[in-house]
Amino acid sequence: MEKQKDNVTSTKEEILCTKKEQNIDMEKFNSIGFLNEFCHKNKYKPPSYTTLNQNGPDHSPTFNIECRIVDYKPNGKFIGSGLSMKEAKKNAAFKTIKELNLLTLNTENKSSFRVVEIIPYIEKEPHEDEGLLCMWNGDCKKIKITLRKKDGSIQKFKSFLLKIEDSVDIDDI
C-alpha cells in the first residue's frame, strides 16, 4: 500500500460509494450473489452453472463446474473446481467475475457525497480540521465517516472508496 502521509486532503473530497474491493477475501466475498446481482441490475438472464465432471476417488472427488452469462458474453465459459459442488460453483462465479473485470466496471450503484463529518478514534479530542490530517499522519487507526443525503438522512454502505479531488503537500500547511 502506498504511503499517503505526504498528502492531506482538502475539503473537496468525495466519497465514491461502491462495492469495489481491491483485495478480495474469498471466504467473505459472495461471488454467486454478486454475479446474480450484476445480471439482475443489467437485465441479463441469470448466470447458468453446468457440472462438467467429477474427478478423483469417491471419498475425495473434485468437481468442475462451468459458469456462463449468455447475454453478456455469449462465448464466455469459465470453469471453477472444488472439493464440493458448492465450492466449485463459487469458484466458477469468482473466475467469471475476475476474467470479465466485473468488479471494475461502472455497473455498481455509485453516488457522490461530500464529506460531512469525520471523527477519528483517538483519545484526545481533535481540533476542528484535525480529522482529515489524522487520517494521514498515523495518529489513529480507524476513522468514522458519516455520509448524509441531501435530505439529511444517513446513508450506510458496506464499503467505499475515498476519491481525493484535490491534495496539498503536507509541508505547505
From Swiss-Prot:
Record PROSITE patterns: DS_RBD
SUPFAM superfamilies the UniProt entry points to: dsRNA-binding domain-like
Presence of the UniProt keyword Secreted in the record: no
Signal peptide per UniProt: none
Keyword Phosphoprotein: no
Residue intervals of the DRBM domain: 30-102
Source species taxonomy: Viruses, Varidnaviria, Bamfordvirae, Nucleocytoviricota, Megaviricetes
GO biological process: regulation of regulatory ncRNA processing; siRNA processing
Superkingdom per UniProt: Viruses
GO molecular function, one term: double-stranded RNA binding
Residue ranges the record marks as coiled coil: none
Alphabetical UniProt keywords: RNA-binding
Organism: Invertebrate iridescent virus 6 (IIV-6)
Gene Ontology CC terms, in alphabetical order: RISC complex; RISC-loading complex
UniProt xrefs under Pfam families: dsrm (PF00035)
Protein name, per record: DRBM domain-containing protein 340R
